[in-house]
Amino acid sequence: RRQRQMCIRDRLKRDIEGYKKTTQDDLINMQTGLFGYKGRVHFQVAPCLNDDLKELDRSLPKPDLFARISACIDRHIHCNYQIYPGNYVAYDWLNGTTEFVSNYTEEEKQQFMNYIEQQLAKIKIPNKDEDFLREKLLLMYSNPLVNYLAACR
């Protein structure tokens, strides 16, 4: 449901000039995130960041220092992502490649493709732009892999 809401919001932003997300949108997204289906869940704690933080130049202007601290935290989060077959399939499907084909089976690929099509079928809006919505779903599923690769290479 959360993916559908995000896709619909992206379409609204694209199609309606000046569209702004409302407080109600945030509440619905939080509710969906808390109570919705989770699929596979991976929880991991990264090593202590103190050594990395000690390396930062404390004389930087605060906005720059905070940006570097945020980047450090993001890097640790992204490097600890658990990447699943669906993330690899989404990346290859979105980009028209087979770059990560060794990371999933044909059965896993078909399961994920069916899942995406089922999610699209649940979206009930007039003049549904399935290509646009599919792209948004694939972006959501491929982004963890993109972030992981950017942080850990």
Label every model-predicted segment.
Residues 1, 45-47:
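A structural signal for short, well-ordered beta-strand segments
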Residues 3-8:
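Short, small-residue-biased leader/transition segments that mark boundaries at the very start
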Residues 9, 56-61, 84-91:
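Short acidic alpha-helical/loop segments enriched in Asp/Glu that coordinate divalent cations
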Residues 65, 77-153:
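Long, low-complexity C-terminal extensions of enzymes
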